[in-house]
Every structure is written in C-alpha cells, then in structure tokens.
Amino acid sequence: MEVILLEKVANLGNLGDKVKVRAGYGRNFLVPYGKAVPATKANVEQFEARRAELEKSAAEKLSAAQARAEAINGKEVTIVAKSGDEGKLFGSVGTKDIADAVTALGVEVEKSEVRLPEGALRNTGEYEVDVQMHTDVTATVKVIVVGE
C-alpha cells in the first residue's frame, strides 16, 4: 500500500514523502491517526494543493515542541513514594507520575511523551528520563525518587 505522509513519522519518512507500507499499518494506524493518506491520484493532487499549509503547521508544531523542551530540559522533579528499608518501592513510579510532576513545573506533558525504556522506576534514587515532545525534539529531566 502506498501512502503520502502528512507529518514526519519516525523510521518512515518526512512530510510529503510517498512511501510503501504494509496494508495493515497504513489502514489501522497511519490513516486513522491522520498521519497519512492513501496515494490515489485525487489525494496526490489535494496534497500538493495543501502542501504549504501542512508544512507551516508542521513547523509551528516543531517550534512549540522546542519551546516546551527548553523550558524543562535539565530540570529536576522529586517524587515521593512509599518504600521499604532497602530503597525498594511499594509499587512503582510510572510515566503518569512523571508527567504529572513535570506538568506541576508549568509545562504541559502527556504521559505518552515520557520515555522509560527499562519500564517503571521501582527503586529510590536519581534517574535521567527522556521526554519526547516531537519526533525531532527530546528533553531530559532528572527524576529523584524519595522514599516515604
């Protein structure tokens, strides 16, 4: 299935690229989420007519993401959680907890933007956590988990 990308998609291409993807990926993810349209003649013509508008909105999203990233990059957030004697938490600190703590700093962050490659934090200590605001923009936040 060939699609035209309406925004930059990681590991696939940039705005306006015509790429060949598996039918299920195109039908079930790219098209419903507004990231692409099927590459029919009508859609190609319509895309070329709207290209400048789409590029402008993509540039605005990128600059907004960069501004948000600069506001939180290098900041520290402290999260208090119940823990045992050896620093092991009862439960864990997940993406929602980190997103809420960063949002309390004054920058709106969704839990889907927080990247925890090793999974939820289960011990007390200091962690470097990436917050991916945009495909090209990532900020690093220092998360300090303190036992209660």
Swiss-Prot record:
GO terms for biological process: translation. InterPro entries: Ribosomal_bL9, Ribosomal_bL9/RNase_H1_N, Ribosomal_bL9_bac/chp, Ribosomal_bL9_C, Ribosomal_bL9_C_sf, Ribosomal_bL9_N, Ribosomal_bL9_N_sf. The keyword RNA-binding applies. One of its GO terms (molecular function) is structural constituent of ribosome. GO terms for cellular component: ribonucleoprotein complex; ribosome. Gene3D superfamilies: Ribosomal protein L9, C-terminal domain, Ribosomal protein L9, N-terminal domain. Keywords: Ribonucleoprotein, Ribosomal protein, RNA-binding, rRNA-binding. The keyword Ribonucleoprotein applies. Belongs to the bacterial ribosomal protein bL9 family. PANTHER family: 50S RIBOSOMAL PROTEIN L9. Binds to the 23S rRNA. HAMAP family: Ribosomal_bL9. This is Large ribosomal subunit protein bL9. It comes from Hahella chejuensis (strain KCTC 2396).
